[in-house]
């Protein structure tokens, strides 16, 4: 069983029912819906196909709605793409003008108030660099430092500039409401700056009467500076290395990745490493050696999941890419598991009752050579606490909630199942016997270590560890 999870971005390359079934069988655990592209009708159809494919394969597949976020962009050019050359003058304006080689509008009307002379402006993921020379009313006049081609709706980044945009744009609010009504299991918030950004998402969720975990995409320098508070406030993190490497020193991004992975594991929050993991497989049938190392090192660092973007959504080899990534992940896990239980912070003890019970369960399973860990969980927290120790035993999570089952598809080592509500520990034991016997990986007499709360079904009451011999 592969423990680490694979997140696949959906798109035209994997849009049919048959392709989605193949993607799941190849190793997809979470389907990412990128709300930067596509209409609500397209997403709805894709969602229904994912649920149908998941049902056919019998797998728990999480649906992640990734909001576009308040991305600052250029408006449009009257005659298509233009090429800027070093030394050219170029104006970005808040006025509605047809774009050309000398001027273009922007979606962000607060730009003139946020920038000043000498500020750096990056366009198209940093491929074009401008320097502000003057702010004149609605016009931000710049000079081109590094030239290149720019075109409609290309992104604008402002390294070192505090931008006064809301956490959610109007489009994000509409997309969030739609995604919740559609039935998504998780939501990713783009361009998070601090812990308070999650409040705006929760407000909309409360209005819709449905809360799901919110994943913080760390891609702004402010989020790096506030990473401990961000990890504490959100339900998980995506290390979005693409935009982060535009505004943050490129050479420091690997260290940010390692710090975030460690921090998330310590707090039992799932963490996804994303962007350019298998980029060459958009057009090639094999990854580069560097890409294989990148994926493996993310797993060795302790990431719960690795993510594919264009590789799976528009690439030429989406199924092969997932299969290849899965092989790399399994090989890295062999190395990881050979090291035994992974301490969170050497010498430090768990701070909570639930954390202490989870650690005890993992250590008992390790000492006794147990075949599995079993978590009865309503919210998924018990399973996530077990997951962070990276035990050799797979974690079987039993929950009455289908949403929790799908959300746990993002957590390392967890295989989740929807089961009827149990009223006592005796019923738990009976359920474990009947459910695990259905799985080919368990046999009569195998040792499993169970953890749950008593009374059952109450969130936050994990207080029990039980050693059980299957069928005994």
Regions found by a protein language model. Give the residues of each.
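Non-catalytic helical/linker scaffolds that mediate oligomerization, partner binding
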Residues: 1-472
